[in-house]
């Protein structure tokens, strides 16, 4: 299945590789929009089952599908099936790569075949690694790429010296426009576990409500639960005696960030980058089953910068929630400043600049 776009005939051509999750697709789309605004042709390679199949076509970009699966956290039968398909899938990608001026990879299993095809054909490859610890695909190709763009300073050690730059991850401009918030008498806490919600955060937050109520600690809670636990958590919150609201999802996340004094959340690369852009202090609870435990590495990086506190998933109880929230309230201004200093604005523009620099005629 191919979705066509109308673009200038003189445009350079860039292939965007990487998908499976929103964390891979959304930053790639930001770079793709920037390239398109400069008059270039941009097309994506992905699978029919990944997030890219839902997000890319509505943006008007050409979208070519391949058959490939992941190698992390799957059975040996699935690994064998993926590896057996790899040669033919890479060969098919060669046809798409042939006319590309350069390939942009966000990593992830979807990026493997087009990147390998590009390397064989000596097409320049620019890779963007969103996490503090690179994913499997980016680790494999690390020394072969033309340029590497990373979000965390420590990640540069995995890529060639002199060809690596800390650009940050593309983040919506609305997050950068959030002004510093003066703390009022009531601590505004935002709890979000992502679009699906987090069982750990939902459970710990619910257990903490009696502690906040009994202590008289002034808080107002906005809790995004995901759809599965929404009714249960909302009913429990209604009996808590606390101010706030429980919602299944948040459509305008920049507005929710702007209203918060403190954010309690997971530590995916996109979330960490949004926290930094918004200058928001946070309590980070890494998802323990993320590939290579990359969320813990992301959280550790922000904690070292003084912008966050890390709490392990297994340790996040109601008591721990209450303890950590009350212990950081005197540090929120300093943490927010540290978060904003961690941010890297203009990541999509810088990525587009570098792609133009390395593009072959």
UniProtKB/Swiss-Prot annotation:
Localization (cell): Cell inner membrane
Residues annotated as transmembrane: none
InterPro entries: GlcNAc_MurG, Glyco_trans_28_C, GlycoTrans_28_N
EC numbers for this chain: 2.4.1.227
Pathway: Cell wall biogenesis; peptidoglycan biosynthesis
Membrane topology of the entry: Peripheral membrane protein
MF terms (GO), sorted A to Z: UDP-N-acetyl-D-glucosamine:N-acetylmuramoyl-L-alanyl-D-glutamyl-meso-2,6-diaminopimelyl-D-alanyl-D-alanine-diphosphoundecaprenol 4-beta-N-acetylglucosaminlytransferase activity; undecaprenyldiphospho-muramoylpentapeptide beta-N-acetylglucosaminyltransferase activity
GO cellular-component term (any): plasma membrane
Record: residues binding UDP-N-acetyl-alpha-D-glucosamine: 21-23, 131, 172, 195, 250, 295
Disulfide-bonded cysteines: none
First-level EC class: transferase
NCBIfam families found in the cross-reference section: murG
Similarity annotation: Belongs to the glycosyltransferase 28 family. MurG subfamily.
Protein name from the UniProt record: UDP-N-acetylglucosamine--N-acetylmuramyl-(pentapeptide) pyrophosphoryl-undecaprenol N-acetylglucosamine transferase
Annotated organism of origin: Solibacter usitatus (strain Ellin6076)
């Amino acid at each position: 299945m191919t979705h066509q776009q109308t673009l200038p005939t003189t445009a350079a051509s860039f292939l965007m590789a990487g998908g499976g999750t929103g964390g891979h697709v959304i930053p790639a789309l930001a770079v793709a929009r920037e390239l398109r605004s400069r008059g270039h042709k941009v097309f994506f390679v992905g699978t029919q089952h990944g997030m890219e199949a839902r997000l890319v076509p509505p943006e008007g970009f050409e979208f070519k599908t391949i058959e490939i699966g992941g190698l992390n956290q799957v059975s040996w039968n699935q690994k064998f099936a993926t590896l057996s398909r790899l040669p033919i899938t890479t060969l098919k990608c060669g046809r798409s790569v042939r006319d590309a001026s350069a390939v942009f990879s966000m990593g992830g299993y979807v990026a493997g075949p087009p990147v390998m095809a590009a390397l064989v054909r000596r097409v320049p490859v620019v890779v963007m690694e969103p996490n503090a610890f690179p994913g499997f695909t980016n680790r494999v190709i690390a020394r072969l790429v033309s340029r590497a763009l990373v979000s965390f300073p420590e990640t540069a050690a995995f890529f060639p010296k002199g060809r690596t730059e800390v650009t940050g991850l593309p983040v919506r401009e609305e997050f950068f426009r959030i002004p510093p918030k003066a703390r009022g008498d009531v601590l505004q806490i935002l709890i979000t576990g992502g679009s699906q919600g987090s069982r750990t955060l939902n459970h710990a937050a619910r257990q903490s409500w009696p502690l906040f109520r009994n202590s008289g600690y002034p808080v107002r809670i906005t809790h995004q639960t995901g759809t599965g636990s929404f009714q249960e958590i909302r009913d429990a919150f209604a009996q808590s005696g606390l101010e706030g609201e429980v919602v299944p999802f948040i459509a305008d996340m920049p507005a929710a960030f702007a209203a918060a004094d403190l954010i309690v959340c997971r530590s995916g690369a996109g979330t960490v980058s949004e926290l930094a852009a918004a200058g928001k202090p946070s309590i980070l609870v890494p998802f323990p089953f993320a590939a290579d435990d990359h969320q813990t590495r992301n959280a550790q990086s922000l904690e070292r910068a003084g912008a966050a506190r890390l709490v392990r998933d297994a340790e996040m109880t109601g008591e721990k929630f209450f303890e950590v929230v009350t212990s950081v309230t005197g540090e929120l201004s300093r943490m927010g400043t540290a978060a904003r200093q961690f941010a890297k604005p203009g990541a999509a523009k810088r990525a587009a600049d570098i792609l133009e620099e390395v593009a072959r005629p």
